[in-house]
């Protein structure tokens, strides 16, 4: 594991909040919490897409409409940045034009940003919450942690126990995402639960124990271990079980284990990560990886001893 890379993503010097301005109410509390935890500077970025200028309101003077939109966005972000600085949080803002995904990725490269916070607020024809196209493309293509936040997010009460849920897949090497989750929990003095969901396979009674053993083995590789994680193994459909666990335990953060990044939106939308992000009520970190784990002779991924069963323990 590259320790320099790990340190950069777990303790970033700057955090980028990519906002459409309508989502600031639920993005800012998350950004503030993470900035306080890491000491990072907050960047606020709004990108005005080309279609924003093609409207009835722009009429015969599209240039005037462009400048009005730009100045208005600048004023909003400047006011927010000032408020954060008055709260002793380092913050700066910028407004750009053209295509949001390209501009956000360009900004990340230019400023060496190691963490992105973005909203997920698109809705389908039946009103079902989906991941907006900008957030979806960023999740699929970036190699830094992306924290997605939905409009249903509510800041937890101050006296509420701080919990982090790490949903681990053993199909892909989860080492750096596991360490990321452990470091998040240690930095915020949070209770960490590691959840592995195995699809039903009634013929292998030792597989739940095998998954537990594999997770414990991964944890032993982390030094120093500053938290004592709880380990849970459940059976069922992975996305459904992860969402159910979030609803039951109400974590402040969800970390999804490394999943294979795909340039194809159809492939991503069919996967566990997309369905979980679109449904859970808490901010969710994703850390993509294209590296698959080799099959083990004693443990086969995504199967368990008994349908509907769960196993738990503490490391």
Name these PLM-found stretches.
Residues 1-7, 134-153, 211:
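Extended, non-globular alpha-helical segments
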Residues 2-62, 162-207, 220-230, 251, ...:
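Small/aliphatic-rich secondary-structure junction motif
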Residues 62-75:
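A short acidic, glycine-rich active-site loop
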Residues 90-94, 228-231:
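Rossmann-fold cofactor-recognition segment
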Residues 95-103, 234-241:
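Charged docking surfaces used in two-component/phosphorelay signaling
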Residues 107-113, 247-251:
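Glycine-rich phosphate-binding loop signature in dinucleotide/nucleotide-binding domains
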Residues 115-137, 253-279, 293-297:
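Glycine-rich, Arg-bearing micro-motifs that act as flexible, cationic patches
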Residues 118-120, 145-152, 257, 284-288:
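Short beta-strand elements of ligand-binding domains
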């Amino acid at each position: 594991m590259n320790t320099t890379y790990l340190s950069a993503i777990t303790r970033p010097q700057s955090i980028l909040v990519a906002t459409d301005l309508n989502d600031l109410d639920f993005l800012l509390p998350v950004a503030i919490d993470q900035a306080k935890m890491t000491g990072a500077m907050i960047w606020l970025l709004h990108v005005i897409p080309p279609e924003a200028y093609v409207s009835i309101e722009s009429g015969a003077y599209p240039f005037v409409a462009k400048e009005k939109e730009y100045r208005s966005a600048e004023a909003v972000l400047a006011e927010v940045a000032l408020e954060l600085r008055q709260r002793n949080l380092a913050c700066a803002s910028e407004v750009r034009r053209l295509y949001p995904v390209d501009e956000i990725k360009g900004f990340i490269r230019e400023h060496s940003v190691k963490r992105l916070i973005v909203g997920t607020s698109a809705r389908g024809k039946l009103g079902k919450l989906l991941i907006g196209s900008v957030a979806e493309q960023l999740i699929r293509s970036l190699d830094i942690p992306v924290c997605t936040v939905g409009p249903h997010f509510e800041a937890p009460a101050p006296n509420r126990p701080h919990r982090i849920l790490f949903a681990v897949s053993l199909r892909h090497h989860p080492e750096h995402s596991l360490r990321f989750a452990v470091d998040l929990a240690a930095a915020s003095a949070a209770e960490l639960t590691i959840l592995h969901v195995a699809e039903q396979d009634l013929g292998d009674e030792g597989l739940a124990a095998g998954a537990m053993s594999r997770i414990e083995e991964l944890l032993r590789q982390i030094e120093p271990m500053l938290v004592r994680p709880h380990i849970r193994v459940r059976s069922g459909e992975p996305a459904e079980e992860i969402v159910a666990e979030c609803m039951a335990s109400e974590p402040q953060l969800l970390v999804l284990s490394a999943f294979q990044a795909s340039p194809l939106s159809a492939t991503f939308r069919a996967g566990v990560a997309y369905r979980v992000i679109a449904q859970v009520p808490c901010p969710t970190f994703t850390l993509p990886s294209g590296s698959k784990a080799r099959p083990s002779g004693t443990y086969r991924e995504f199967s368990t001893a008994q349908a509907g069963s769960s196993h738990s323990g503490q490391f």
